Structures are given as structure tokens and as C-alpha cells.
Design a protein with these regions (language model features):
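Polar, enzyme-active/binding microenvironments
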Residues: 1-300
Length: 300
């Protein structure tokens, strides 16, 4: 700010250090294609494939920044599920029952148990969503209704029911997303893809593309500052979004896809995977150190 009395201009400078991934504690239940949301120190891993990807699990675990602990099971085991919220108030929605069958089931977490809520208008799995959404406001977009059919329809959640409101420009499945219900980014998807679209609360706009095409990635952050990491085929790369462009930063220790993700651009979390060789219960923590200082400039 500028002080008219002293003729001094004070500026705030933020300096970012080198970003890194480091190992965290393993999940109790190995899984992939699960819902993941929360923060680096308070994350949720919900349902998904089990150890050998031969069946789905009802298991729900929470991460406290140092270890995972089991909580109450969900009502319906599923994979290809997405979610949003916190460890005290979460929401999961959509599912793949088998390669040719999907569902629109919704469940809400109240810090004690899961309860069944209204289903989506269009059943789908492997969709895009806003990981920073809440139990009162979030969205689901695109995904799959069959292995070869991808709806472009978007639905918003108001705490009670789903409503169709808009369509994404390019329909696809296995896309990742970050942000909130009125301001979000979705990236990548089937093929794999480099496509990125931005949501402003009323419509979707295609914006700057990813550097590396990917699908089945995880993501974290807000519309103007986010991360996309991992993805198929067994990608380790992390890309950071600054509101206008993507920059490749630190790689995961192990490339993986169908992983869960949560957190921010400076403190993210990656957990689980579809590929057995990548450690289906492995957790990695992303850290991008930053320092903030004030600079005073005299005005002549």
C-alpha cells in the first residue's frame, strides 16, 4: 500500500522454493479409482478397487497428516467414484458397477456415518468434479455412461438434489478437477487428452492446455492456483496452474493412475493407485515452500 504521509510504498513479495514429493504413511486398505478429497493434513479416501482390482471395497479411511485410520464404511461399494468436502462433512457420487453399467448414487458423510441421498439425473462414473466443493454445493460433469459413451451434461448439487445446468465443451471420462462449485478447472481425460476447461458458475470455456496429455490423474487447488498429478499411462509428472498457464514441477516418486488427490498448490496429497506396481496403498505429500516478505520503496 502507499502511505501518503511518508511517501512510502510497501509491497508484499512471495518467493516459492523448489517443490518436492515425499513419502507419507501407507493406507490400511490398498485401492484405486476411489474418491479423494480434503487437505494434506485431513484427507478422505473412499471406496474404490481393492488390493488386486478384482473387487470393490466399502472401506473409508482418513489421513491426519501422519497416518491413516479406518472410519465407518460407505453403504455401497463402488469404483469410478468422485467426491468433495472435508473429513467432517463429505460427499461421494457416481460409480462404475462394471465396464458396461454405471450408477448415480450419492452418499453424505457427517463425521459419524454415511447416509444415502438423492441420485444424479444422469448415472455416470469416472466424472469430473470440484474437489473443493461442499456437501451443500458441488458439481459433477461428463464421465461415462458406457465404455464408449461420454455425457457432456453437468449437474449441480444444492445439498438436497441434483439439477442439470450446463454442458462441457468436450465430453470425456477420467478427467480431473479442482476448485469450488462456482469456479473450477477440469483437465485431461480419455484418449488421453491435454484439454482444459474453466467453469465460472454459468458456462465452460476452453483454456490453456496441459503440457502432457493424461487421464485418470488427481488434482488439488482452486481455480486460479492448482495442481494436476499422476495419470495414465503411469505418469509421474506434476503440472502447476497459475491462472493462465501450466508449468511442470516435481514428479511423483512413482508414476501412477486412478489415484486420489487433495490439498492445495503448496501442500498436496496423492494416495492409492490402480497399477499394482506403483503401490496401491502408497501416499505421497507435495510441498512447495514459500516465504513472504515486505518491501518498502521510497517515492520521490
Amino acid at each position: 500500500y502507499y502511505n501518503t504521509t511518508t511517501n512510502l510504498l510497501k509491497l508484499t513479495k512471495t518467493v516459492f522454493g523448489t517443490a518436492t514429493w515425499s513419502s507419507g504413511s501407507n493406507m490400511g486398505t490398498p485401492r484405486g479409482s476411489h474418491a479423494g478429497f480434503g487437505t494434506q493434513s485431513a484427507s478422505s479416501a473412499v471406496s474404490g478397487y481393492d488390493q488386486d482390482a478384482s473387487a470393490v471395497t466399502v472401506n473409508y479411511e482418513e489421513y491426519d497428516g501422519s497416518s491413516w485410520s479406518e472410519k465407518a464404511n460407505v453403504n455401497t461399494a463402488r469404483y469410478g467414484v468422485v467426491g468433495c468436502g472435508t473429513t467432517t462433512a463429505g460427499l461421494i457420487y457416481g460409480q462404475v458397477v462394471n465396464p458396461s453399467t454405471v450408477g448415480g448414487l450419492t452418499e453424505e458423510w457427517n463425521n459419524t456415518s454415511w447416509s444415502v441421498k438423492n441420485v444424479m439425473n444422469t448415472s455416470r462414473g469416472n466424472s469430473g468434479t470440484a474437489g473443493g466443493g461442499t456437501t451443500e454445493a458441488t458439481f459433477v460433469v461428463s464421465g461415462q455412461v458406457s465404455p464408449s459413451s461420454f455425457p457432456s451434461a453437468m449437474e449441480t448439487w444444492n445439498g438436497t438434489s441434483w439439477t442439470e445446468v450446463s454442458e462441457i465443451n468436450t465430453a470425456r471420462r477420467n478427467l480431473s478437477g479442482f476448485g469450488v462449485s462456482t469456479a473450477a478447472i477440469v483437465a485431461g481425460g480419455t484418449s488421453p487428452s491435454i484439454l482444459v476447461e474453466s467453469w465460472n458458475g454459468s458456462s465452460w470455456t476452453e483454456i490453456t492446455e496441459l503440457n502432457t496429455a493424461a487421464e485418470e490423474s488427481a488434482a488439488s487447488g482452486i481455480q486460479t492456483s492448482g495442481l494436476v498429478f499422476g495419470g495414465a499411462p503411469n505418469i509421474a509428472r506434476t503440472e502447476e496452474w497459475n491462472g493462465s498457464s501450466w508449468t511442470e514441477v516435481a514428479d511423483l516418486a512413482t508414476g501412477r493412475n486412478q489415484l486420489g488427490g487433495s490439498g492445495t498448490t503448496t501442500a498436496g496429497l496423492a494416495f492409492g493407485a490402480e497399477n499394482p506396481s506403483g503401490g496401491r496403498n502408497a501416499t505421497e505429500e507435495f510441498t512447495a515452500p514459500q516465504s513472504i516478505s515486505n518491501v518498502t520503496v521510497a517515492s520521490s
